[in-house]
């Protein structure tokens, strides 16, 4: 299924199209283009069951208990008791630690010959820590709630037991789907699909993928033929479960929820609840992996896992949150020098494989067009692109030995892109968790090495306190000013003289400010402290352009500051 495409470096980029929308809906559409109707929650079902129980008790005790207020209080009390009992039942009964590891050798794990042959073909012999702690209990049929660092080998940890189960049960296409893997993004789903294809090279079982943006009819045809191992994004999976005739899922024996916190973060909580209700739960093994254990993740674990799951956490609180082979640093840079420093860095590292993270789709679009226009070839990846474009870009960069990818956080979670040398956080991350996931695109695997560089303005240095609290070690890097290419005048002249680039720069500038104003860490990222003249220069403007920013009170402060700076 590998796809490739040539990088386009055309001289006349088209104007950017701005499609304003509400924040939550925008983030959700970035990962799925279809939506699904909401259905009643588990709580409503529970209330119905409690009603039945109450009526039975009322018949036994007489009319005195049938007072409406008494009935309401009784239902509320029983509902609370039931939820507490359910939480207690699904509370992990044990936590795996390093002593639980029996072997770190795949050949000693009791795997089938077809799986061992595939693992050998992939070049693996030893398990990572998360694999050694997860695979044996999953092979034994336990439910697992896992927390692991990015780049720890989690994908193999859940795919190997799933494939072994299909093999041992001798699944055939006519049996339909036996394992469902749910992933938050299309790119991550494609990556898991690629790993599954390698692992199942010597197995007879079938595998497939359903994701938003792909051809739904072709997906339905494959499902009707029988897909034993199915990788999916939430919205498209729910669509097929509800609407595809001939999709056999009554034999599902295992459910894997990968990056559960991210799935919930981008707005798929209701879809996941519906998926779990639709899939058969009798004797179903479940595996849930999440980088963070939020209340919503705990609720999802409660309804998806059987009582007493095994909790696996491969990192203690005292350990660094990022992998050992990663060299991390930051540079303090005024806003007007940010692009000049980035341009100089990329020019000096054209033989490296680099990922640059930006805060918005329009910023990625503008800087992609600009860099390609000035003959610094880059690929770009963001949520407003069509799925085929995103897929082509992803695989092209994966297969490249050198090159530059500029992207939004759509590429920050879970993606296993080989041999990335540098991670550049040109626009700062929202919080330490996002920082960790971004840098996790390099130094992957047991012996992986890589470097990361984060750009900070002087007013953003407070973010370092949060990283220190999260056990993230950083060093300050310094770049001599005489080593930075001073191309500001050429940049300004180019933006003035090219209508399409000017419009794209304006859209990028607007979306940068809006993204900045929406940061969660308001004490660090204070939009009132931004020097808009300097910010505008980084986009190629002499003076800040007039832009409409729909962020309420923050938008007003921007306009006032804009006018004040113009008078100065």
Curated annotation (Swiss-Prot):
- Binding of ATP, residues: 148-155
List, in alphabetical order, the Gene Ontology terms for molecular function in this entry. Answer: ATP binding; ATP hydrolysis activity; identical protein binding; RNA binding; RNA helicase activity
User: What does the record note on quaternary structure?
Assistant: Associates in the nucleolus with the 60S and pre-60S ribosomal subunits.
What the entry says about domains is: The Q motif is unique to and characteristic of the DEAD box family of RNA helicases and controls ATP binding and hydrolysis.
In which compartments does the protein localize?
Nucleus, Nucleolus
What is this protein's record name?
ATP-dependent RNA helicase HAS1
- Biased region (Basic and acidic residues) positions are 22-32, 63-72, 79-100
User: In which residues does the motif Q motif occur?
Assistant: 104-132
Entry's EC annotation: 3.6.4.13
């Amino acid at each position: 299924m590998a796809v490739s495409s040539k990088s386009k470096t055309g001289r006349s980029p088209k104007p950017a199209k701005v499609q304003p929308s509400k924040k939550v809906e925008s983030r959700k559409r970035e990962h799925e283009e279809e939506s699904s109707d909401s259905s009643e929650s588990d709580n409503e079902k529970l209330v119905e069951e409690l009603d039945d129980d109450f009526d039975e008790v009322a018949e036994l005790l007489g009319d005195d208990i049938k007072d409406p207020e008494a009935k309401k209080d009784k239902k509320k009390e029983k509902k609370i008791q039931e939820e507490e009992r359910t939480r207690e039942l699904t509370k992990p009964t044990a936590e795996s630690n390093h002593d639980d590891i029996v072997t770190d050798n795949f050949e000693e794990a009791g795997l089938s010959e077809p799986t061992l042959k595939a693992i050998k073909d992939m070049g693996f012999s030893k398990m990572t820590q998360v694999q050694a702690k997860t695979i044996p209990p999953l092979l034994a049929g336990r439910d697992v709630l896992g927390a692991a660092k990015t780049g720890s080998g989690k994908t193999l940890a859940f795919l190997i037991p799933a494939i072994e189960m299909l093999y041992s049960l001798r699944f055939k296409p006519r049996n339909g789907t036996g394992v469902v893997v749910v992933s938050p993004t299309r790119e991550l789903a494609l990556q898991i699909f690629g790993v599954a294809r390698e692992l199942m090279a010597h197995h007879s079982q079938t595998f497939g993928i359903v994701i938003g943006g792909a051809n739904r009819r072709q997906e339905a045809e494959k499902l009707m033929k029988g897909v034993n191992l199915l990788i999916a994004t939430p919205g498209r999976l729910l669509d097929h479960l509800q609407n595809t005739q001939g999709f056999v899922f009554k034999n599902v024996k295992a459910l894997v929820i990968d990056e559960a916190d991210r799935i919930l973060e981008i707005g798929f909580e209701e879809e996941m609840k519906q998926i779990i209700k639709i899939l058969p739960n009798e004797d179903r093994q479940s595996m849930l992996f999440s980088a963070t254990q939020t209340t919503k993740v705990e609720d999802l674990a409660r309804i998806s896992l059987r009582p007493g799951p095994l909790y696996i956490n491969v990192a203690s609180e005292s350990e660094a949150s990022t992998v050992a082979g990663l060299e991390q640093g930051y540079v303090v840079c005024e806003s007007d020098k940010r692009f000049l420093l980035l341009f100089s860095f990329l020019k000096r590292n054209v033989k490296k494989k680099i990922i640059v993270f930006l805060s918005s789709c329009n910023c990625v679009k503008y800087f992609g067009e600009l860099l390609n226009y000035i003959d610094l070839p880059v690929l770009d990846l963001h949520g407003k692109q069509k799925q085929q474009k995103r897929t082509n870009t992803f695989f092209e960069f994966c297969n490249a030995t050198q090159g530059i990818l500029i992207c939004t956080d759509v590429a920050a979670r879970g993606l296993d892109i080989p041999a990335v040398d540098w991670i550049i956080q040109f626009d700062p991350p929202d919080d330490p968790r996002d920082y960790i996931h971004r840098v996790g695109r390099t130094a992957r695997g047991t012996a992986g090495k890589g470097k990361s560089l984060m750009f900070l303005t002087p007013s953003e240095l407070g973010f370092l306190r949060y990283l220190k609290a999260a056990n993230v070690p950083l060093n300050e890097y310094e770049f001599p000013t005489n080593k930075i290419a001073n191309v500001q005048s050429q940049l300004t002249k180019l933006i003035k003289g090219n209508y399409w680039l000017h419009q794209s720069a304006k859209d990028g500038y607007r979306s940068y400010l809006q993204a900045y104003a929406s940061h969660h860490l308001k004490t660090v990222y204070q939009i009132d402290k931004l020097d808009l003249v300097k910010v505008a220069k980084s986009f190629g403007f002499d003076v800040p352009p007039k832009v409409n920013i729909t962020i309420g009170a923050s938008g007003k402060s921007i306009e006032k500051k804009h006018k004040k700076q113009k008078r100065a």
